[in-house]
Amino acid sequence: MSGLRVYSTSVTGSREIKSQQSEVTRILDGKRIQYQLVDISQDNALRDEMRTLAGNPKATPPQIVNGNHYCGDYELFVEAVEQDTLQEFLKLA
């Protein structure tokens, strides 16, 4: 797969995960950055792919990937936004 992907889930009981996913997509949309939303709840293989790319067998959404390069999780995303290094974080610069 190529391009920017945000791994998320449409099925979660966690308000925290829902909130984090919404914030990531809101910021990307606001900056007009194109991405593909990958719903891991639809296929266990997608969840496994997300965890493999993240290098963490317990990784939870949202996780951000560009091509086959892992960018980071929600905390790293927010840090990049706050430090105005989002383009570098997303491997777009």
Curated annotation (Swiss-Prot):
Does this UniProt record's set of keywords contain Zinc? no
Its cellular-component GO annotations read:
cytosol; nuclear body; ruffle membrane
State the compartments where it is located: Cytoplasm, Cytosol; Cell projection, Ruffle membrane; Nucleus
PTM field:
May be glycosylated.
Record Gene3D superfamilies: Glutaredoxin
What the entry lists under PROSITE patterns is as follows: GLUTAREDOXIN_2
Q: Which InterPro entries match?
A: Glut_rich_SH3-bd, SH3BGR, Thioredoxin-like_sf
Q: Pfam families in the record, alphabetically?
A: SH3BGR
Q: Which residues are glycosylated?
A: T9
- Ranges for domain Glutaredoxin come to 2-93
What are the N-acetylserine sites (modified residues) in this protein?
S2
Is Cytoplasm a UniProt keyword of this protein?
yes
What keywords were assigned to this record? Acetylation, Cell membrane, Cell projection, Cytoplasm, Glycoprotein, Membrane, Nucleus
GO terms classed as biological process: cytoskeleton organization
Query: Where mainly located?
Result: cytoplasm
Q: How does it assemble?
A: Homodimer. Interacts with MYO1C (via its IQ motifs); the interaction is dependent on calcium and takes place at membrane ruffles.
Protein purpose: Could act as a modulator of glutaredoxin biological activity. May play a role in cytoskeleton organization.
Family membership = Belongs to the SH3BGR family.
Q: What is the name of this protein?
A: SH3 domain-binding glutamic acid-rich-like protein 3
Query: What organism is this sequence from?
Result: Mus musculus (Mouse)
